Amino acid sequence: MLYSPRLTDQILIVAGEASADLHAARTLHELQRLRPGITAFGVGGPRLREAGLEALAPAEDISVMGLAEVLPRIPRILGILRMLGRAAAERRPRAALLVDLPDFNLRLAARLKKLGIPVVYYVSPTIWAWRQGRAKKIARVVDRMLCILPFEERFYEGTGVSARFVGHPFAERPPPGPAEAYRSALGLPASRTTIAMVPGSRPSELKRLLPPMLQAAERLRAAHPDAQFVVPVAPTLDRAALEPYLAAHRTLEVRLVDGRTEEVVGASDAALVKSGTSTLEAGLMLRPMVVVYKLSWLSYAVARMLVKIAHVALVNILAGRGIVPELLQGDASPERMAAEVEHLLGDRAAREAQIAALREVRASLGEPGAPLRVAEEVLGVMR
């Protein structure tokens, strides 16, 4: 249904990393379709800006992972928090859509609550994994919590949080085609062994993950001389950010692709993927993969004390068991990465078992239509 426009139809949107930027942009498109004339301001990346967001600050300024990484950025992050609070007080948006990024967005939600601005929070914080006490704060400052994982709505029962499972945005994606079709679309030779490497969307992730990935690639090339390696460059990054790492491996054939992570993984025989949303994005392409992640020693020590779950890879969490290998911290070495990928390339039974489990994960994500359901929730709370 279409909603009649009003002169003051303005909303605040805040999205940090690349996946949140994409989810928010698709929701904004649905809002514009349902309520022609609606406008948005806030913080977002390239996709939100293309959708029409008036960006008051770049997304990368607030998208920081890990305690050690956050500390030097605190003054800038707090400055943006104050700036958004002032902008909300001046513009009085009719609602706010805050996407992921809980340490920042829950603080902003508290300020918006004092201003009487309804808050829709999209992509629940992982309170089921750690810091479960945050549910009390969420109940105080968030009007609607929209969950993208099927078990999260049940977790909020009895907490006072108004939560709804809206389906995962990735459920919009059609089933993957054959690897050869993706290779053709990317201009890659169809017959060569193809390995995807997904190092993440933050500079800190590149610094920690891309060098060992490239070293693992050198080892894999020794076993597979025809191998080609493909790296998707996140929209929040510039190709130039990767060049210093590639310079040390000039003889290695590495193809950079702007965005298009799902196509890059779809083109692969196996993939090295950083932990986070990327693991689900890659998993939906039904390609064998190995999940890797490294934090600073301080961030990892804190996480070890606080995290209450057995797995870190989202596909493993959704499956309820370890369906893909996880290499964390010291285990994320070039030797281990290469060995795990080699196992998936050479062991057909292991490869097929992983793909079968990934099919089950894909089926658990709900029906398509998440952006529309989120847009309707935003319109439902607008003052």
Swiss-Prot record:
Q: Does the keyword Oxidoreductase apply?
A: no
Q: State the coiled-coil residue ranges.
A: none
User: Top EC class per UniProt?
Assistant: transferase
Q: Name one GO cellular component term.
A: membrane
Pathway assigned in UniProt: Bacterial outer membrane biogenesis; LPS lipid A biosynthesis
* Reactions catalysed, as given in the entry: a lipid X + a UDP-2-N,3-O-bis[(3R)-3-hydroxyacyl]-alpha-D-glucosamine = a lipid A disaccharide + UDP + H(+)
Which region is the signal sequence?
Answer: none
GO molecular function terms here?
Answer: lipid-A-disaccharide synthase activity; phospholipid binding
Reported EC number(s) for this entry are 2.4.1.182
Q: Which UniProt keywords apply?
A: Glycosyltransferase, Lipid A biosynthesis, Lipid biosynthesis, Lipid metabolism, Transferase
Name the SUPFAM superfamilies for this protein.
Answer: UDP-Glycosyltransferase/glycogen phosphorylase
**Domain of life of the organism encoding this protein:** Bacteria
The GO annotation for biological process reads: lipid A biosynthetic process
- Name the InterPro entries on file: Glyco_trans_19 (IPR003835)
Give a short account of what the protein does.
Answer: Condensation of UDP-2,3-diacylglucosamine and 2,3-diacylglucosamine-1-phosphate to form lipid A disaccharide, a precursor of lipid A, a phosphorylated glycolipid that anchors the lipopolysaccharide to the outer membrane of the cell.
Family of this protein = Belongs to the LpxB family.
User: Under what name is this protein listed?
Assistant: Lipid-A-disaccharide synthase
Which gene codes for it?
lpxB
